[in-house]
Amino acid sequence: MGPKAPTTPTKKAAATKSKPKPNHPTYQVMISTAIAHYKDRTGSSQPAIIKYIEANYNVAPDTFKTQLKLALKRLVAKGTLTMVKASYKLSEEGKKEHQATLGPVAKKPKAKTTATSTETTAAPPATPTKKAAPKKPAAKAASTSTKTAAAKKNSAKVTKAVSKKPAAKKAPSKKVAAKK
């Protein structure tokens, strides 16, 4: 009986060691972000999805491709993805699920931007204290405020430019349809 007792705890210890938590999100999330990133009308190919995931996530290279193939098959069977020729697209359900998963992620960058804005407001007061000339700090303080305003305008322009790009893509497709 003595030898049997030690074998049981070693099995439990081995079982706990064999299940490390992955450092990446689920395959469904990774695949949907890869497809949404490319925004192709015909969908994204499997090699493109693999390339995006390997570049952006820390995945185990030995089992990654087989797990990805199985995940793609599972998502097509589930209805989250649709297969078009050799490409994969997000279905309507998949788009809703993807946006639901990105909801909390979109809130986090907003918090980061507020942190960076507080850092930028903290930086200008530090610069006038270093400068000894009394006339220059007032002029430079005004220039820093204009710089922060310009930075805010630039960020607004960036968001506007992003919103204009999809509209520009839609317009040529409508013209092509009109020519037919």
From Swiss-Prot:
Reply yes or no: does the keyword Transferase apply: no
Any S-S bridges, and between which cysteines? none
Record-linked CDD domains? H15
Q: Which residues form the H15 domain?
A: 23-92
Biased composition range(s): Low complexity: 1-17, 112-131, 139-161
Q: Where in the cell is it found?
A: Nucleus; Chromosome
Q: How is it modified after translation?
A: Phosphorylated by H1 histone kinase (HKG).
Protein's UniProt name = Histone H1
UniProt KW keywords:
Calmodulin-binding, Chromosome, DNA-binding, Nucleus, Phosphoprotein
> Which Gene Ontology cellular component terms are annotated?
extracellular matrix; nucleosome; nucleus
Sequence segments annotated as region (Disordered): 1-25, 91-180
What is the stated purpose of this protein?
A: Histones H1 are necessary for the condensation of nucleosome chains into higher-order structures. Binds calmodulin.
- Family listed: Belongs to the histone H1/H5 family.
One GO biological process from the UniProt record? nucleosome assembly
Q: A GO molecular-function term, please? A: structural constituent of chromatin
Tell me the superkingdom of the source: Eukaryota
Q: Does the keyword Nucleus apply?
A: yes
Tell me which PANTHER family the record gives: HISTONE 24-RELATED, HISTONE H1
Residue stretches spanning the membrane: none
